[in-house]
């Protein structure tokens, strides 16, 4: 059995996708330099902001996220799990929360659309309701050999 090193990246995402991509790349590069085989980005790595902005950006942001993951995997020669990012769903009033697993060669290995949506009232009084604008996917399991 060979050694395998995974890196779990933590970010403080904002409503500015470009700055989020820059911050994510810095962490991916660091993880790769330290020998990571797999880099996991957090949910909402590319955008964390108002629902109305997320819905407006969803189609563009979904493409940007997929391209970003492919570029990073190839550039740093790591497998990347891009934790949830918004993808348009239905009539445009909902998004799916999608994660993609991309191989070192930039090939999409697996895709997962979130099933269990999260609702909470934060201590600062701001409610967070994925169920309001989030689409629900169907259960499914994919097993991938990333070697």
Region locations from a protein language model:
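Active-site beta-strand/loop signature of hydrolases that rely on acidic residues for catalysis
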Residues: 6-9, 20, 28-57, 73, ...
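Active-site environment of divalent metal-dependent phosphoester hydrolases
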Residues: 47-48, 88-90
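Short polar catalytic/cofactor-binding loops
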Residues: 10-16
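Generic structural signal for well-ordered alpha-helices
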Residues: 28, 66-69, 141
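Glycine-rich anion/phosphate-binding loops
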Residues: 18-25, 62-63
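Active-site catalytic loop in hydrolytic enzyme cores
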Residues: 61, 90-147
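Beta-strand-turn-beta hairpins that frame and shape the catalytic cleft
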Residues: 1-6, 143-147
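A short, hydrophobic beta-strand-centered structural micro-motif
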Residues: 62-88
């Amino acid at each position: 059995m060979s050694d395998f090193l995974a890196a779990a990246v933590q970010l403080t995402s904002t409503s500015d996708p470009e700055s989020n991509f820059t911050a994510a790349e810095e962490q991916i590069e660091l993880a790769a330099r330290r020998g990571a085989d797999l880099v996991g980005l957090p949910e909402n790595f590319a955008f964390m902001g108002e629902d109305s902005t997320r819905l407006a950006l969803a189609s563009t942001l979904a493409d940007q996220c997929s391209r970003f993951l492919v570029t990073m995997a190839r550039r740093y020669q790591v497998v990347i799990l891009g934790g949830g990012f918004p993808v348009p769903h239905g009539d445009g009033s909902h998004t799916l929360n999608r994660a993609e697993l991309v191989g070192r060669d930039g090939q999409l290995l697996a895709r997962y659309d979130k099933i269990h949506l999260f609702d909470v009232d934060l201590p600062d009084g701001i409610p967070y309701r994925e169920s309001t604008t989030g689409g629900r996917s169907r259960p499914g399991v994919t097993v991938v050999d990333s070697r």
